[in-house]
């Protein structure tokens, strides 16, 4: 094989290795810190919602306490709200004989005003329920439980508006947090299940599939700086095949394991550089090919993000490949065939 001028080759290799490793560090910081910050924020918001919902069962806050009630003064419930509710939601028309009663206060201090099943003495039809902390539900009831369309306004200002089944959000609904974070999509048994979209006040968004309240399946996550990930999620983690496009033009297309680059992947830079090969724990490791925009190439072994082991270096000016040994990103020696 032909030879390369030793000093020029070393200078070029050193410069190229520096740029490549510098971008590797930037990429690692971006992936681990910015990405995880958004994912944790999303997961925390969802968990807060579940805790509030579990604390505030629509049927009875204390299941061991008998569901007794007493009539209270009508002025404690806004009569106009009930009238508006009747305009929004039509009668159930399920052949149940219902009647509108004056407001009733249960032994747990929950107040209900609306329609009742006359025979079973259960909330049934359209009604308003208010908790002692100011939380309020306006919507439809069946057999004593929230069922159908309804809106739950939490004491802290959070709002869920959508479908209900047996006191739990199920079907399609919108949840708006007091800070402006919003979810529109499908629910099942009080958890996000199916397809949905979340939006944050800073412009961050996620649209895709959910299972039991977590991102699971295919989804698209966009950051406020216009970075975007399109691919698979598993148990609220980026996991599987996916493409991450950085705001500065860099792009990674390949395998992910729990929010980290791991497996086979292709990483490209806007200036024309490209790496195609193995990754482990966010770093190049295994076999890979690195190409520079001036035509130079390295193919061979990598470890901890650097050339390490036996590899081949291509010089386009000489149109030659030369085999060598690299250690921690530096060429140690050439190997003569």
Regions from the PLM with identified roles:
Residues 1-337:
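Intrinsically disordered, low-complexity repeat tracts enriched in Gly/Pro/Ser/Thr and acidic residues
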């Amino acid at each position: 094989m032909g030879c390369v001028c030793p000093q020029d080759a070393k200078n070029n290799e050193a410069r190229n290795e520096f740029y490549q490793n510098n971008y590797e560090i930037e990429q690692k910081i971006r992936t681990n810190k910015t990405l995880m910050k958004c994912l944790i924020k999303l997961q925390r918001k969802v968990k807060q919602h579940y805790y509030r919902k579990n604390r505030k069962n629509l049927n009875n806050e204390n299941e061991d306490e008998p569901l007794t009630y007493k009539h209270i003064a009508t002025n404690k419930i806004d009569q106009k709200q009930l009238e508006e509710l009747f305009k929004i939601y039509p009668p159930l028309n399920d052949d149940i004989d219902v009647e509108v009663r004056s407001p009733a206060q249960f032994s747990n201090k929950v107040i209900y005003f609306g329609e009742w099943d006359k025979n079973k003495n259960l909330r049934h039809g359209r009604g308003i329920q208010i908790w002692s902390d100011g939380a309020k539900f306006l919507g439809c009831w069946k057999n004593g439980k929230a069922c159908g369309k309804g809106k739950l306004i939490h004491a802290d200002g959070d709002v869920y508006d959508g479908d209900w089944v047996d006191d739990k959000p199920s079907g399609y609904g919108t949840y708006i947090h007091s800070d402006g974070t919003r979810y529109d999509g499908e629910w099942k048994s009080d958890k996000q299940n199916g397809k949905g979209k979340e939006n944050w006040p800073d412009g961050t968004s996620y649209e895709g599939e959910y299972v039991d309240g977590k991102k699971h399946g295919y989804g698209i996550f966009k950051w406020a700086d216009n970075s975007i990930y399109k691919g698979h999620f598993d148990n609220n983690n980026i996991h599987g095949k996916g493409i991450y496009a950085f705001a500065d033009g860099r792009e990674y297309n390949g395998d992910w394991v729990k929010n980290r680059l791991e497996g086979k992947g292709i990483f490209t830079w806007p200036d024309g550089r490209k790496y195609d090969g193995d990754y482990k724990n966010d770093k190049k490791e295994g076999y890979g090919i690195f190409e520079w925009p001036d035509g130079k190439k390295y193919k061979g072994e990598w470890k901890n993000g650097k050339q390490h082991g036996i590899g081949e270096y291509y010089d386009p000016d000489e149109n030659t490949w030369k085999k060598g040994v690299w250690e921690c990103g530096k060429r140690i020696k050439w190997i003569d065939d």
